[in-house]
Structures are given as structure tokens and as C-alpha cells.
């Protein structure tokens, strides 16, 4: 049985099911309770589970993130919502020094089963401070898993897996994908956190991407196929750890790769993916890896300039054609 849900509804369904399944699961963050969350992911959950399991907090990311880590240390399973993931920079100390490292620094005595989730990425004129690509900042934190959903289907299955995981998971939801609608199973399903997905099989070139850029890539693929090319498309999903096996298998087949990301180029996810492929599949490559990233500038408020910062489908088409000609 299938039903059609928006992504924000699929995320809510995942949280609802996990709260019903495990009484240790609770939600906390700014306006997650009576207001239902900034994008309505937690709407009406406080009515069902009460104010102690859907906990409204003050506007103090460092405080409630630290509280969630402490709760996780005692055996609870907190799900933190960042009203905007850019604000998690205010809790960088708690996430890096506590959530990411406590299992190691305690000699394995502490586990931190914590999910930190919320809207991020470049939206519609949200300007610089609300358009951070935080995956670049957090990818170097030891002990932290990073997952980026791209569809209602994988959003639900991945969030359920993240809540059940015994490690801290940073769960990235793109602000412009909340209203993406898709048929998903009514019956329970859980997806692996550490596996990339081959979205489209092909033989000519491997296009690696994640989150909202998957949809830009798929627009470009329509044009490439119409021009006689057969690209393979991989949705990374797991940004940390990277599913290297899937990437190497694909590159060993196509012998050419291009990475498309919304992250800034300097220190971005693509830089790490390139390094991993070069380290493990260099001899399989017939050409240097290409990458398309956002500009290394603060995201402008002006709509035209904002779009100029982003990778567009036409740029992907041209980059793939150039790569194919080498």
C-alpha cells in the first residue's frame, strides 16, 4: 500500500512512528511543540505525546543541544530540531567536543544516540546567515555521521534509521524539498544510513551528487540522454562516512566522474569525494574528476545573484559534455 506525502509529512511520520515504538525518543527545539516546527515537521505531535516528549526550548542552540547530549548519555534518544541548521554553528562546541567525541574520550563508556535535524541549504532569498551549507563545517568532526535526504521516501526511511542508531547523526533536510511530494509505502521501512543510491544506471559517466542538487542533476540528465549520452547518477545520501564501494564500482564502469554539490568548493564534500576516488580508483579514471560547486561567497539576498551562486542544470550539461570529450 502506498500513500502520497510531502517530505515534511514523511519526516513527521518517521518521528511519530519512532516515538510510538520507543518511549525513550523525544523531540526538542525552538517552536517544535505547540507551533509544530518552523516547517511543520512536528505539527500535532505535542498533542499526542505531551509537552515533555515534544519540548519547546528557549532560543539558545548551545543550551538545548547540550541538554540533548546529556539526555542521550542517560539512555534517552533525543531528536533535536534546528529551526535553521545554520544556527547549529552556535552549538559547534557541543556537537564537536561532546556529541562527536564523548564515546571515544570516555573509553567507550558513553554512547550518544542523538539526531540533530532541520532545514538547511540555499533557499529562496534567505540570505547569507540562513543559507549555510553546514556539512562542510561538520564533516571533520570525529564520531559524527552526516546524512542528506533527497526525497520523501528516503527522508522517512533514513530518519527512522538515524533515530535507532546508537551514534550522533546530523540529518540534513533541504529547505526547498519540504514540499516535494512522492508516493511512499504505508508499511514500515528503514533504510541504511551508510549507503549511496544508484538513482540511474549508465555507462558513459558517473555523476555524484546529494540533496537538492540531485534534482538539478536529473533535469540535466534528460538533456544528456536526448543528446545520446548515458550517464550514471549516484545520490551520496551518506556524506560521512562516504560509501566508497558504490562510488568505486561505478567509476570502474564509466571511467569518468563529475561531482555536483550545493556546498562551497573550498573544503566542500566534493573535495573529500574526489580525494577518496583518487586514492582508491585512480587507475580506473580516463580523465580528471570534475566538480561543480556553489561559489565561495556568502549567499546573496538578491534572487538573481543567489541563483548565480548555485550550480544550474545547464552548467551540468556543459560540464558533462566537456568531460565526455576528453
Swiss-Prot record:
Q: Which domain of life is it from?
A: Eukaryota
Q: Which cofactors does this protein require?
A: thiamine diphosphate
Please write the reaction equations for the catalytic activity of this protein: N(6)-[(R)-lipoyl]-L-lysyl-[protein] + pyruvate + H(+) = N(6)-[(R)-S(8)-acetyldihydrolipoyl]-L-lysyl-[protein] + CO2
Q: Which EC numbers characterise this protein's activity in its record?
A: 1.2.4.1
Give UniProt keywords alphabetically: Chloroplast, Metal-binding, Oxidoreductase, Plastid, Potassium, Pyruvate, Thiamine pyrophosphate
Subcellular location, in the record's words? Plastid, Chloroplast
- Tell me if Chloroplast is a UniProt keyword of this record: yes
- Where is this protein primarily located? plastid
List the coiled-coil residues. Answer: none
For K(+), which residues are the binding ones?
114, 162-163, 165, 167
What PANTHER family does the database record attribute to this sequence?
PYRUVATE DEHYDROGENASE E1 COMPONENT BETA SUBUNIT (PTHR43257), PYRUVATE DEHYDROGENASE E1 COMPONENT SUBUNIT BETA (PTHR43257:SF2)
Protein name as it appears in the record: Pyruvate dehydrogenase E1 component subunit beta
